[in-house]
């Protein structure tokens, strides 16, 4: 829902993209349904199903208030990096766009991976969370994002969604969540149209 401009940008340029989903989203007991929905959404965005991985770890269950262990996240992410020779990670920032604690936990897991020195040749970038005005300004936020990225001295990148219709179609694959307010979110959210990535130092 948040990363579709980045995914579209990378797949259209033939990057070897892998998606690691650290939970099946079983907070409402619909984990298996949501797993299949994400597979279909990734197919719309041209990510091969064999390059999408889900975890259903007992200590990484989805839900507000269910804080994830950062050391465990670091170990799991580190194993994926090693197993697939990954040299570039894109994740949430420390607010996680929506403020969801699990989004924030993933950021801290990646941050810890970078700081422990075990992965020296890896680069990581975070999806920048914006204030509520920018978040719901739709395509107008492209201009703000471009300005911030230009003034960042190379620490930020602005990725435009060149295929917004695919983002709508991909989100529509999540039929269990495709309710009226999420349709409005996809239409008005700046994250449908542009992603601003910031390098994690």
What are these regions (language model features)?
Residues 1-121, 173, 180, 185:
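Active-site beta-strand->loop->alpha-helix modules in alpha/beta enzyme cores, enriched
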């Amino acid at each position: 829902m948040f990363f579709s401009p980045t995914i579209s940008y990378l797949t259209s340029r033939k990057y070897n993209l892998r998606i690691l989903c650290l939970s099946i989203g079983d907070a409402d007991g619909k984990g298996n349904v949501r797993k299949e929905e994400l597979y279909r959404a990734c197919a719309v965005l041209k990510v091969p199903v064999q390059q999408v991985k889900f975890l259903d770890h007992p200590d990484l269950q989805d839900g507000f208030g269910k804080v994830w262990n950062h050391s465990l996240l670091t170990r799991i992410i580190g194993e994926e990096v090693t197993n697939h020779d990954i040299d570039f990670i894109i994740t949430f920032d420390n607010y996680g766009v929506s403020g969801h604690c699990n989004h924030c936990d993933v950021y801290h897991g990646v941050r810890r991976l970078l700081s422990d020195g075990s992965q020296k040749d890896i680069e990581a970038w975070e999806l920048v969370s914006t204030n509520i005005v920018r978040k719901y300004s739709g395509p107008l936020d492209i201009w703000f994002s471009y300005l911030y990225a230009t003034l960042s001295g190379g620490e930020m990148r602005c990725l435009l969604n060149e295929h917004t219709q695919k983002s709508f179609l991909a989100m529509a694959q999540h039929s269990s969540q495709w309710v009226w307010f999420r349709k409005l979110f996809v239409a008005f959210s700046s994250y449908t149209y542009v992603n601003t990535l910031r390098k994690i130092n």
